[in-house]
């Protein structure tokens, strides 16, 4: 995904944080040559402006691009924004949320993505068996589980946690590094159960003083946040307010259509030889702070630092009500051996039930992605808490296959 419009955000992070992660060589790999040329040119100008001594090159040859790599970062989108637009629209016909990582749309993305990612990972392993794979590719939980199940050296990463850390630090008037989160759940299904500064949980005071602003940012009622007593991730809105979200999505253009328009303008700007920094427009694309999270995680993996990062990794008994091979999103100590989750308090039943349900869905989704077949797709959809009815699951199965046939080898 080196030609992604996200890439300048990542490049800017590498340039600014070169003391944390001194990159000698960065290779952008993407099959889209035109985009790659635009993004690569801007990447070089960003490095040059900030005085970074590392080299940047780009190629459409995956094997050549990963040869000799210490770490490989994945941020790809199989089918592009056109496929995303489908993921966000056809589920609405059944009254189910249309979203690229949640529900039927999320399953469609997983089915398209997992085989491609596993092929890339196998080629990385053949070239560099010790290389780490850092996955940003959604749905991160399912993709990371696929990688780890296949024995790859992989860690999944999302920008939700670092986004909350930065937001809370700003509200509290402290440096981001002073804020630690008790972040728990699955990718795109998490809650902040504590916000600590100097070892003290300041979440109750944070909600008392800034609860209205936090709830508004989440687009959830203040009363819900107060009654939960935690800060849910933005994606919990699809569960706690499902029907309202469906009504809202039916009345406006899809997020994919909005992003596609932003991407067209971004690529036009990237081609300007005078541009030597990430444009402000990129902030509307999403993905804030993910470059910093990526730099921190990669530096811990390659530097064997043992620092705590919030990542997607194997459960391994951390949440005892989940299988050991489930992938959870929690704080973990990151070393050259990978990510080891820190011990956590038992998860409250109010949250644990949903986590268990979605974990079961993710298991079935991965089975469908690896083995194919209409019945496996149907079972995954039927198990999802946002679907759960046979009539919906049957129609969504047919629609998913019809819209994604070119990406499904078995269909």
Regions found by a protein language model. Give the residues of each.
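Rossmann-fold dinucleotide-binding core
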Residues: 8, 132-201
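Rossmann-fold NAD(P)-binding glycine/threonine-rich loop
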Residues: 78, 82-150
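N-terminal Rossmann-like dinucleotide-binding module
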Residues: 2-22, 26
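NAD(P)-binding Rossmann-fold cofactor-contacting core
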Residues: 19-46
